[in-house]
């Protein structure tokens, strides 16, 4: 079934949307009262799959070049992009793990270096307003370039990486086929970005939005109604249910005092990019697609479970204390946002070509960063 683009889709009947979101008009505080009818199981007739903004179904993945995608697929999974041949893009963004390195609170890079921030999912990244929690990369290409030279992530230099790739005949041929030239940093980052553009994960929520009412259970639809009613969609909107704005961590109630510990540079968020005081502690709102697979949550990995994340967000961002039943229903809805094609993405992974570095001349040391065949790719 072909999914309709978001500007033509509707998520709830207009009458229900009006009832559930009236408290959001003019940026007023969300109504903390839940309509009595939402306390009961919701029959199919109450929530027909006629859905409306601010939520939307996932649009089709953009058109891509198959040769560039195949090359990017291999590069994404190749540890030769790191300084010591041990870390790949997939090390922190594993497709069989929600596109993250769950359950790590923050990523671990080259030499066991512990990074300062939680790894966001790579799935559906194409539709995000910017890349990274602080939005420092405008494009997927810029995002792909950064970790390679980050000393706590992949710890390499692009010049050395390209030299390494030029020593692999299969890569030389693949770059020639895809780009009509030899390996370069621009070609490599574009290929990785082209691959990432294919990592869309439509699921049951999209089938619901396209008209298949029974794609969501009664409890999941009750959770959706609550999610909308209490104001979650003021930030988690659009086809990704997030990824389109930057919001302060602790909009209504202070977050960092509750968390405790030192406030780090990573905690400054968007401020690190813009240096604007108004951006202090602001972060890109994360997508909620596949959120059930990406624990722990928040930029610092503070919330260990999805239930705890929902409770903390309601408290700090909306000024609301949820009942256990409300939390349960919202979590049920969030679990329905997992993609139905995740296994297909995993099966489509292409292992990088194995190659042995050229043997050094007698008496000369081996090339720094050279890798053995078994080290060429992540499992």
Annotate the PLM regions.
Residues 2-5, 10-12, 23-379:
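Periplasmic c-type cytochrome electron-transfer domains
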